Amino acid sequence: MIVSLWMAEDGGMLFNNRRISRDSEVISDLGALASDSVIFISDFSSKLFRDAPFSVIESSNPLECAGAGDYVFIENLRIKPYIEKTEKLIIYKWGDKYPSDFKFDISPEKEGFKFCESYEFSGKAHEKITREIWVR
């Protein structure tokens, strides 16, 4: 599966069970990458994808449901238990730090991923967003 997520520079994803930030340009970029594929999302993320012009499947545990080649977007889930199923990571990073109490729970390099590419673009809420792609 191909797991995508967004986080602050320090790996922070949530604070007090709330997303630390968001940007609709990330959703658009992910939709373009996934093209004709379906993106699995959690109930927590459903509001972000409500008006998306592409297909999503909402699940209480999208990491469990997704198979090889499927896209998954996570915000409030730990990837570590599903790392062996993960073939690619798409990580969107804000150029800022935010208070957080839920962080990305792996180091891609330590889990055997290799950095593939980086792309910077402007968002609606963030001047600079960096998309990193890591592959096995």
Model-identified regions with their sequence ranges:
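Enzymes that bind and transform nitrogen-containing heteroaromatic metabolites
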Residues: M1-R136
